[in-house]
Amino acid sequence: MNVNNLFFEKPILNSPYEYPSRHWELDAQGQPTQQIIEKRRRAEFITPIPKPKKRKTTTVQQDIVFDEGKGLSTQAQKYDPTPIINDLRYHVDKWRSIPNPNDWRVTPETARLLQHWRHHQFSTFRPFFCQIEALEAAIWLTEVAPHEKAGKDFLTHLANANNEANPNLMRLALKLATGTGKTTVMAMLIIWQTINAVRRPNSKKFTRGFLVVTPGITY
């Protein structure tokens, strides 16, 4: 095996069904250094650009400004959500590691669903880790965060962000890559909400009403 091409010979290090505990290190230009880091990659915006055969000078890859094309951010002043995403990951990881379901601070119905999705030996399609993590993030923010100091800080941040964008519509977005099964995550969210709403009709945390908007290019 060529030590200079380790990344290209084995680019995938983790199982899609398990916690991503390793990653390939990338340099400032988004190129692989051929070094494996024994921990999860932090959330960040990376756009790997193929290295040209001839390069006169070394340039650092310029960050992309994410402002939905509205000109709301510039290179000098831009909105960067990655710090709070990484912070949320930390708290969800810590919560996930709690062994006793009675200490999860969720409803018994939610606890049973989590145990099923995390540990059931599915005979057909098994949920990917990223699908379960997306659901866990929504559950943690809804059921756990209101009872913790760190959680309340997240909720305040989300409320302020929503007030700046659209004060009349509280929104929470979950971003998953193409092919990771976003439709399945929507179904899991609906199941979680519906079961709890039926058992707790007076709770404002859960609902039985859903609006599903889908593009016409999904097959």
Task: Tell what function each PLM region has.
Residues 97-175:
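Conserved pre-motif I regulatory segment
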Residues 166-169, 201-207:
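Short helix-terminating capping/connector loops at secondary-structure junctions
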Residues 180-181:
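ATP-binding Walker
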Residues 129-136, 184, 188, 217-218:
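A structural signal for well-ordered alpha-helical segments within the folded catalytic domains
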Residues 137-139, 184-204:
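Walker A/P-loop NTP-binding motif
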Residues 185, 204-219:
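Conserved Walker A/P-loop ATP-binding site and its immediately adjacent core
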Residues 1-124:
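N-terminal accessory nucleic-acid engagement/regulatory domains that precede
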Residues 175-177, 213:
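Generic beta-strand/beta-sheet core signal
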